[in-house]
Amino acid sequence: MEKKYDVIVVGAGINGIACAAYLAKSGLKTLVLEKRNECAPFALTEDIFGAGIPVDTHAGVCFLPMSPVWGDLELDKFGFDLIVASAPAGTVWEKENLVWYINPQKTAEAISKFSQKDSKTFLEIVSKIMPDIPEILQEAVFSPAEEEKEDYLWSLGKYLGFPPEEFKTMNCFEILDLLYESERVKTASFGACDIAVFGDPAEKGEGAVMTALAFTIVIGVPAGGMHTLPHSLVRCFKYYGGTLLLNAPVERVERKEGGGFRVFLSEDAPYPQKEFESKCVVMHTSPPISLKILGDLAKQDDDFYKKAKDWDMTGHCAFTSYFLLKDLRWESESWNPDIAKVPFPLRAYDSWEHAKISVQKMKNEEVLDVIGDIAEMYNLSAVDPSRAKSGYRVLVFEMEYPINLRRYGGKQKWDDRSFVDIIHNGHIELLSRLIKNFKENLVASMYFTPIDNWRRNPSAIYGHELGGDVSGPQWYTGRIYPRSKIQGLYFSNGIWPASLTHLGSGYVAATCVAEDLGVKQKQEWWRWKPYEYFLKKLPELKKI
């Protein structure tokens, strides 16, 4: 086993592997070390019901269409196959729904059932923002967070009709109140902003940016399951000479005299070689875990050390319920039957007033009062035949809850099944309102709590899926900088953007490493802008 590398990446989440694949393709000798026995613990696809149905047990929404990574790494050649739904998302209520189509004109028609004025407003915004989506995503998402770029974020207000000095003091609630008249349109739009995870929609500034960036989101469905994304990334990484070691927990990272690093595996790692050397190290573990691994070395970067020791990972922790069903028909199909074709339906409050109350209750950590109020649902069999078998299908219901549970006895209550059953049963009761004969068609159900997810992904403290809260003091420049003040040390977890399936954090970290080592400008293939590869591929993609 070789000892010396150009770059060592600690952690094989999807963004860690994406970063490593870029660097390996750039000709850098790259090693990835992963504690677990498989990569990408939050991009798993499993047959959890033993029914032969692949279920995405965490990430279900694939944001890769908006990413440059798809094109740069040519993931199609490595097995990645994306399905594009004509109606990828939609918000469901008991008797109504609002479907978001890939064709803006059709979305406007759906909005017009609630408000002709709002339909016109939506089209006006889309017509202004669509030509600039590649630039917006490149500057606001696929670039390192920098104080000088904050003015660019505030300039996004022009697409919604607000000058920068006003936009930076607005939140999502205020903007949607000023843009739209229909409560349903406001509520559905707020849900879309919230799911995008570019900040807290209720906070000034970041909520405004979330509202603008929601218009840039493009999603798809990986055929066969989300696991095909990390599989294609690993194949790409290995094709370009990368080395991946699983069951390889990193104990510590030390600086070498004269430059470079030593990376040590724990004593119980099943490898005779426990030490590796590299010019650069990329930490793809959450900031508190990185802080522990770096030890005293972390103190040499005062910005990272100050942030990491107080890093908040308590606010965005998924509780996910899974339902094996004989049939799935929405109560609102009579309003618009296309909701049956939507792979990513959204539950977003009963009313606009309910949204305002629920958001505050969530901040108050009144968990039992907000059960099922705002949630992502995955009905992937609507577009992917492999997600159904013998007439059975799986519906996933994922909601992020605050983790502390101080009102209910503390975090240990997540291991009290009598308590968490209340949340799961709350999801069932809600779905019984939204889906015809839900209980009669329910064959089996199960769930993962935030603590269950933490056990499955040791870096995701409390089951936090984003490498730390993306709001308040941890928003944009408040996140970890990808370039450490320690020469040769980089971060791809806990940075901007959050670690999602657009692979933005891996892209940003790889860009920083490649630029600093002087290899990026030599890579002619490293050229795609966000969203553009998707537009090129669109004519040949499978569409449903």
Residue ranges and their predicted role:
Residues D373, A382-N425:
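Glycine-rich, aromatic-lined ligand/substrate-binding cores of catalytic
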Residues S182, K186-A196, G372-Y378, R433-W496:
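A glycine-rich dinucleotide-binding beta-alpha-beta segment and adjacent secondary-structure elements
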Residues M130-Y240, N247, R456, A460-V470:
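Active-site/ligand-binding neighborhood in enzyme catalytic cores
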Residues G494-A514:
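A conserved FAD-binding loop/helix module that cradles the flavin
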Residues E515-I544:
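Active-site-proximal substrate-binding core of FAD-dependent oxidoreductases
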Residues E251-A388:
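Mid-domain catalytic core of redox enzymes
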Residues K3-Q138, G468:
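N-terminal glycine-rich phosphate/pyrophosphate-binding loop and immediately adjacent elements
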Residues L328, E366-L368, D415-I451:
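Flavin-binding catalytic cores
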